Amino acid sequence: MTGPLSIFYFLILIFSIIVHEVAHGIVAEREGDPTARVLGRITLNPLKHIDWFGSIILPAILILSNAGFVVGWAKPVPYNPENLRRGNKSVALVAIAGIIVNLSLALIFGLLLRVLVTQGLATAAIAEIASIIVLVNVVLALFNAIPLAPLDGFRFLSAVLPRRAERTMRFIEQYSIPLLLLFIVFGWRVVAPFAFTVYSALTGIPI
C-alpha cells in the first residue's frame, strides 16, 4: 500500500482509534466516573490521545511493509472503577464501548457503500475510502475483542466472569504482552477470514 491510499488508510485508522477511546470515556462518564472529562480526554483532538508507538510507529511499519492487516492503539482513556455506579456491570460496559463504536462505524459505512454501489452512485474514490473505513473498523473491533491484556476483550471478561476465574485471568494477563506481539506479527491468518466475512456481509462486496 503506497501513495495517497496509504495516507487515507493511516488517517482513517487514527480517527477510528480515537473514536474508540473517546467511547470508553463517554460510557464511563455516563456510568458515574468523570475522570476522562476532567483530564480532557473526551475530545477528538488527536494530540490528547496519540501514543507514539501504537498510533504512529506501529501502523506506519505495518502499512509500509504491506502487512496483511494494520492495527494500532491510542493512550487508554483513564477511568476510576470506584466511581462507577454499577460495579462490574459498568466496567463491562466501559470495556465493550470501543468495540461497539468500531462495529457501528463499519455498519454505517458498509450499508452506505452497499446502497451507493447498488444505485450506481459510487465513484472509485468513494468506494475505496468507504471500503477502508469498513475494513479498518472491523479489524479494530476484532483485534480489541481478543481476550489478552490490556485489550477490551480481556477487560470485559474480567468483569463478567465469576470470581473463581480470577486465577485463570491472572495467568493470561501474565503472558498477554508476548502473545499479543506474536498475534500482531502472525495473526493475520486468524483475523482475515472473520474480517472478510463481516466486510462482505456489510457491503455486499465479496473479497
Where are these regions (language model features)?
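Hydrophobic transmembrane alpha-helices and their immediate loop junctions
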Residues: 1-207
